[in-house]
């Protein structure tokens, strides 16, 4: 019967279908020839839930118990099983029949005639009423003729299960119609439609196969409805798969676990008859977990005394591939046979072991079902095989106790072989452990083992340095002071364990780029001339640190890393690239050296204190501050530093130093403003009424470049003891009479090219002067010079680089010049009896006290 004939018959039957409301017998029900039916309700009052009940009693057959979960149907509708009346939990009642029967002639007139023409008993409850929720025309062209067949008749046509108890072998036949979606159209009986659900699922399975749905080959719903399909397909199959079971017994727990899954993905499309009859499904294969390969699994043993791995006896063994190792915890002796791959397209990959079973494929012809089964089995083997790429388990000989390095000669070794050259290349990329993240490690070769290398080097250096010390103690836990300078150390990982109680640690002149690994209880830490950057300069945990030297490093930001150390007293950060003075925090430091950095602009200490927002510590405790050799052009409010005693501003292009705050600093004792390049023009306190008064009246030491304002100051600090003026003009020199009120004992006037002589009354103006430094001036007359010197107090005299000490080009010889220097020395000694040191040339001239 062709498709056109089917459509014609179906259309003729649908012509008799009427949708008119039937006659009413009573308010809620009506009858047709004595049968009582539910009243037909309008669409607005119709409830879809009346035809979607899934709750059934256990007495119902397997074919209607568990409708499969159809995830994708290519927009085709599903078939729902209507539960017979008389069961609890359903929407049907005992006195009602399906609505559609009343619209067909001959149904319900006491004969109980079924749609298929079979005659049943009048009192028989229909086993099932199908409700197909979509247009029938959607299935035209794909519906088969003999669709709803008797379930028992189909069972009789299937291939029976053959069980061989001696060999424990089960033979199951498969039909190629399953793969081709060709259903059997033999002459089955149309008497009674006792199990149409399974047949309906077969129809939809054929639709999905023909329409190329997203069901994968080998994936089939593993429920009770599939039993009929598998049994029908077995009729036309002459090829078989022999399954050698070592253990057919399955526990109850395994059955329950298997039935919880809706689908099964396996290489075989059919199940064994024993499984189909009991509702069991094949257990889903799982890949064995991958185990981590450690040095201990390679035979190495860690030596805690030497801090290294002891190599195994078979150290020369080369493991060329990680697949040669068994990473699973299973016992391979339990598996009898492995599935052969058969073809060359597997590229030599090892076959997978399948749950203690050996599968033997008996058909190899390309046209047979067994051949296709074999191909599908091989694809599953490749999918389930452990082909995860792993690097070869490698171990560097540098980390072993012997520390030997094997040299590879001859042929080239593969990238997976263990070779020292490969290992050393890997370690070159892993020198900076803190910059790497553990989550980025994807293979064994990327694991950073530089910790063991550093600790080994550290132990060697400690042994060599401590053994030469007279106070050497074999117990390293008692060591309090260690000097590891010039050791070419890159980091200090492991030192906390080796030297837990060290207090003074010198790590200068190494190659460190981080402070990690240094014992946190250290009090004095010297790390100058390394490669430490601001990103890896963390002082968190160094709560007892008091002295820190990080000079000659790569620090390039601010002082925020110092804020965590509250007990810091001395910090040397010279010769870095620090750009800001912010972030000092509440550390109570006293000495801070920031010379030779990249600090620029105007420094306002009042603003720094407000920004720091620290009641105690920070800038409020600084006593010695060195800002020399930066790019500072202005300084303001030095008086805001209440404890500042020494300030060094040499080597900056300073233009002005101005005090504008009301605070007065009575602690500043030394101020140095030299080598400004002649830019200095203002040194003034705007809060003082007398602008001719020096701004800092408690100074003892003042060193500065000569500028015009010096000659205008009339009141110098009474406490001034050392005055040094470098450069400028003679007219800008201070008046010596204004210095009479000071306690000056050392005066330096250097590099003033137009300064030709001392004032005549110098001995009266500076009666307590002991040191007179006059290098690089234009002093020409020795007799005038000696007459103006303070006779009783001068002990040190420096006359270098003046005309009276420099030989002229027309002089006869060097010996003559030497005799003139001796005469000058005699005059100075005669004028100043207390003179102890006289500098006339690069070497001190002989005096009466040192002859």
UniProtKB/Swiss-Prot annotation:
Its main location: cytoplasm. Pfam families: LRR_4, LRR_6. It comes from the Eukaryota. Keywords: Cell cycle, Cell division, Cytoplasm, Cytoskeleton, Isopeptide bond, Leucine-rich repeat, Meiosis, Mitosis, Nucleus, Phosphoprotein, Repeat, Ubl conjugation. GO terms for biological process: astral microtubule organization; cell division; establishment of spindle localization; initial mitotic spindle pole body separation; meiotic chromosome segregation; positive regulation of exit from mitosis; regulation of mitotic cytokinesis; septation initiation signaling. Residues 8-21, 291-304 have a biased composition (Polar residues). The keyword Nucleotide-binding does not apply. Phosphorylated from S/G2 phase until the end of mitosis. GO terms for cellular component: nuclear envelope; outer plaque of mitotic spindle pole body; peroxisome. The modification Phosphothreonine is found at residues 388, 392. It is found in: Cytoplasm, Cytoskeleton, Microtubule organizing center, Spindle pole body; Nucleus envelope. Residues 223-246, 260-278, 320-333 have a biased composition (Low complexity). There is a cross-link at residue 357 (Glycyl lysine isopeptide (Lys-Gly) (interchain with G-Cter in ubiquitin)). One of its GO terms (molecular function) is signaling adaptor activity. LRR repeats lie at residues 544-566, 567-588, 589-609, 621-642, 643-664. The modification Phosphoserine is found at residues 417, 419. The keyword Nuclease does not apply. Present with 892 molecules/cell in log phase SD medium. Interacts directly with MPC54, CNM67, SPO21/MPC70, ADY3 and ADY4. Probable component of a spindle pole boby (SPB) complex composed of ADY3, SSP1, DON1, MPC54, SPO21/MPC70, NUD1 and CNM67. Involved in astral microtubule organization by binding SCP72 to the outer plaque in a cell-cycle dependent manner. Required for the mitotic exit by facilitating the binding of TEMP1 to CDC15. Also involved in the pathway that organizes the shaping and sizing of the prospore membrane (PSM) during sporulation. This is Protein NUD1. It comes from Saccharomyces cerevisiae (strain ATCC 204508 / S288c) (Baker's yeast). The gene is NUD1.
């Amino acid at each position: 019967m062709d498709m056109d004939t089917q459509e014609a018959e179906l259309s003729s039957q649908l012509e008799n279908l009427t949708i008119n409301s039937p006659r009413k017998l009573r308010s809620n029900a009506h009858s047709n020839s004595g049968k009582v039916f539910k009243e037909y309700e309008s669409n607005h009052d119709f409830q879809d839930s009346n035809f979607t009940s899934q709750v059934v009693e256990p007495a119902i057959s397997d074919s209607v118990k568990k409708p499969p979960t159809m995830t994708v149907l290519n927009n085709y509708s599903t078939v729902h099983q209507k539960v017979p009346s008389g069961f609890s939990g359903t929407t049907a009642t005992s006195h009602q029949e399906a609505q559609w029967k009343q619209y067909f002639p001959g149904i319900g007139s006491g004969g109980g005639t079924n749609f298929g023409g079979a005659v049943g008993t009048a009192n028989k409850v229909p086993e099932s009423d199908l409700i197909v929720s979509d247009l029938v025309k959607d299935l035209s062209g794909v519906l088969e003729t003999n669709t709803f067949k008797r379930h028992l008749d189909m069972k009789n046509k299937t291939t029976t299960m053959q069980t061989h108890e001696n060999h424990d072998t089960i033979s199951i036949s498969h039909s190629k119609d399953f793969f081709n979606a060709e259903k059997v159209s033999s002459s089955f009986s149309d008497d009674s439609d006792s199990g149409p659900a399974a047949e309906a699922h077969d129809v939809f399975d054929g639709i999905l196969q023909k329409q190329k749905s997203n069901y994968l080959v080998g994936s089939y719903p593993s429920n009770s409805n599939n039993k009929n399909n598998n049994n029908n397909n077995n009729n036309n199959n002459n090829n078989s798969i022999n399954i050698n079971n070592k253990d057919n017994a399955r526990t109850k727990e395994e059955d329950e676990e298997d039935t919880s899954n809706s689908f099964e993905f396996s290489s075989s499309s059919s199940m064994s008859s024993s499984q189909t009859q009991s509702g069991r499904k094949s257990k889903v294969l799982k890949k064995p977990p991958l185990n981590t390969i450690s040095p201990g699994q390679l035979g190495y043993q860690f030596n805690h005394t030497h801090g290294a791995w002891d190599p195994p006896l078979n150290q020369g063994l080369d493991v060329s591939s990680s697949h040669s190792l068994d990473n699973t915890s299973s016992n391979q002796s339990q598996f009898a046979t492995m599935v052969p791959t058969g073809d060359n397209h597997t590229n030599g990959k090892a076959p997978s072991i399948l749950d203690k079973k050996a599968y033997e494929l008996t058909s190899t012809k390309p046209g047979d079902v067994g051949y296709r089964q074999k191909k599908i089995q091989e694809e599953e083997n490749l999918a389930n095989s452990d082909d995860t790429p792993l690097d070869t388990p490698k171990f560097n000989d540098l980390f072993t106790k012997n520390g030997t390095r094997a040299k590879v000669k001859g042929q080239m070794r593969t990238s997976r072989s263990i070779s020292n050259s490969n290992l050393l290349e890997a370690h070159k990329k892993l020198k900076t452990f803190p910059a790497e993240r553990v989550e980025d490690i994807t293979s064994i070769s990327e694991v950073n083992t530089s910790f063991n290398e550093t600790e080994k080097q550290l132990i060697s250096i400690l042994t060599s340095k401590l053994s030469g010390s007279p106070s050497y103690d074999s117990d390293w836990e008692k060591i309090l002071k260690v000097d590891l300078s010039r050791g070419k150390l890159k980091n200090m990982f492991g030192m906390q364990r080796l030297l837990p109680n060290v207090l003074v640690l010198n790590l200068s002149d190494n190659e460190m780029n981080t402070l990690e690994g240094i014992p946190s209880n250290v009090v004095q830490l010297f790390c100058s001339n390394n490669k430490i950057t601001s990103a890896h300069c963390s002082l968190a945990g160094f709560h007892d640190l008091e002295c820190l030297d990080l000079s000659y490093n790569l620090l390039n930001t601010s002082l925020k890393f110092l804020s965590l150390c509250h007990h810091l007293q001395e910090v040397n950060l010279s010769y870095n690239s620090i750009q800001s003075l912010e972030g000092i925090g509440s550390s109570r430091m006293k000495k801070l050296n920031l010379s030779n950095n990249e600090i620029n602009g105007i420094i306002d200490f009042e603003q720094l204190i407000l920004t720091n927002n620290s009641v105690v510590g920070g800038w409020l405790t600084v006593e010695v501050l060195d800002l020399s050799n930066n790019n500072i052009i202005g300084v303001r409010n030095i008086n805001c530093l209440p404890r500042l005693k020494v300030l060094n501003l040499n080597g900056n292009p300073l233009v002005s130093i101005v005090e504008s705050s009301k605070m007065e600093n009575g602690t500043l004792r030394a101020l140095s403003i030299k080598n400004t390049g002649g830019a200095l023009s203002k040194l003034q306190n705007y809060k003082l009424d007398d602008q001719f008064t020096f701004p800092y009246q408690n100074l003892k030491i003042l060193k500065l470049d000569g500028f015009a304002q010096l000659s205008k100051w009339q009141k110098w600090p009474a406490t001034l003891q050392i005055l040094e003026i470098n450069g400028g003009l003679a007219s800008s020199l201070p008046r010596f009479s204004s210095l009479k009120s000071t306690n000056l004992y050392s005066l330096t006037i250097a590099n003033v090219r137009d300064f030709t002589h001392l004032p005549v009354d110098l001995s009266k103006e500076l009666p307590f002067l002991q040191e007179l430094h006059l290098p690089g001036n234009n002093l020409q007359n020795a007799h005038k010079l000696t007459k103006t010197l303070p006779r009783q107090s001068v002990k040190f005299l420096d006359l270098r680089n003046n005309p009276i000490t420099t030989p002229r080009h027309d002089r006869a010889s060097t010996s003559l010049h030497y005799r003139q220097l001796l005469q000058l020395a005699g005059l100075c000694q005669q004028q100043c009896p207390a003179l102890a040191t006289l500098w006339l040339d690069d070497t001190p001239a002989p005096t009466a006290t040192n002859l």
